[in-house]
Curated annotation (Swiss-Prot):
It is an enzyme of class 1 (oxidoreductase). InterPro entries: Acetaldehyde_dehydrogenase (IPR003361), Acetylaldehyde_DH_C (IPR015426), NAD(P)-bd_dom_sf (IPR036291), Semialdehyde_DH_NAD-bd (IPR000534). It comes from Brevibacillus brevis (strain 47 / JCM 6285 / NBRC 100599). NAD(+) binds at residues 11-14, 158-166, 269. One of its GO terms (molecular function) is acetaldehyde dehydrogenase (acetylating) activity. It holds the Pfam family AcetDehyd-dimer. Keywords: Aromatic hydrocarbons catabolism, NAD, Oxidoreductase. The lineage of its organism: Bacteria, Bacillati, Bacillota, Bacilli, Bacillales. Belongs to the acetaldehyde dehydrogenase family. Its EC number is 1.2.1.10. One of its GO terms (biological process) is catabolic process. It catalyses: acetaldehyde + NAD(+) + CoA = acetyl-CoA + NADH + H(+). This is Acetaldehyde dehydrogenase.
Length: 295
């Protein structure tokens, strides 16, 4: 099977971790890393690994020729992606947006990836969205969810400048994803940066309100099936306890431990984004090559 060529836009923590994960993919061939800081660790590592390096931003990469990549991962910022999206679309690239910009449709692999493989730009929502929306959707597959609230708690050390500058976009985009993809009638998202030492793992809580008399056994089964699917590409994703029921309210506690490729294991919030991005790209690559997908 031929590999599909990809490039990374953004040489920060997320882009660098993505570079390591892509190096192990049997389907994707990383060719290039694009950034704006020639002294960044990401660009230095990319150069040492033999990839093409562009330190003048997206335009020099696009001017170099179309053959370098069919897929471009954007790991910059929400504001930057709005500009990048237009240029990538005009160049005929499939863009996987790891920022909260949401230019393209929201995608959560366990819920709706198969519906968007013919798009030119898809959005991975946020780390909190990738962690929690599948749980909301699992609950909603059994009983309508009238309200869902998620709380994503991450280590302060895992929140770099990009994360901190995108806080407002994080809460807005995640809440929209809870409703649009999770299926909740009303959604709310909260992010907490915890300065504890040693740094904590990413911890998430989902609160959901369902119909009276909803089938609890079926809800628990749906949650466990969803967790197992996510673990196929994010092994550190796990429940911290069994779902808790209080009349028609459900509380689910879980955590995400990173794989430790480039980022520390406590940076599960970043790891779930890079692992999800690779999963989406591999499914898209199967689609364009014509061998079918697992979706």
């Amino acid at each position: 099977m031929r590999k599909v060529k990809v490039a990374i836009l953004g040489s920060g923590n997320i882009g660098t971790d993505l570079m390591i994960k892509l190096g192990r993919s049997p389907i994707l061939e990383l060719t290039s890393m694009i950034g704006i800081d020639p002294d960044s660790d990401g660009l230095r590592r990319a150069k040492a690994a033999g990839y093409y390096v562009f330190d003048g931003g997206l335009q020099p990469f696009l001017e170099s020729g179309a053959e370098l990549a069919d897929i471009v991962f954007d790991a910059t910022s929400a504001k930057a992606h709005i500009l990048h999206a237009k240029a990538l679309r005009e160049a005929g690239k499939f863009a996987i947006d790891l920022t909260p910009a949401a230019v393209g449709p929201y995608v959560v692999p366990s819920v709706n990836l198969g519906a968007h493989l013919n798009e030119t730009n898809i959005n991975l929502i946020t780390c909190g969205g990738q962690a929690t929306i599948p749980i909301v959707h699992a609950i909603g597959s059994v009983s309508p969810v009238s309200y869902a609230e998620i709380v994503a708690t991450i280590s302060s050390k895992s929140a770099g400048p990009g994360t901190r500058s995108n806080i407002d976009e994080f809460t807005e985009t995640t809440a929209q994803g809870i409703e649009a993809i999770g299926g909740a009638k009303k959604g709310k998202a909260i992010i907490i940066l915890n300065p504890a030492e040693p740094p904590i793992l990413m911890r998430d809580t989902v609160y959901a309100v369902v119909d009276e008399g909803a089938d609890r056994q079926a809800i628990v089964k749906a949650i466990h099936q969803t967790v197992a699917y996510i673990q196929s590409y994010v092994p550190g994703y796990r429940l911290r306890s069994e779902p808790i029921f209080d009349e028609n309210k459900i509380t689910v506690f879980f955590e995400v431990e990173g794989a430790g490729n480039y980022l520390p294991t406590y940076s599960g919030n970043l790891d779930i984004m890079t692992a999800t991005a690779v999963k989406v790209a591999e499914e898209y690559a199967k689609y364009v090559v014509g061998i079918g997908t697992s979706m």
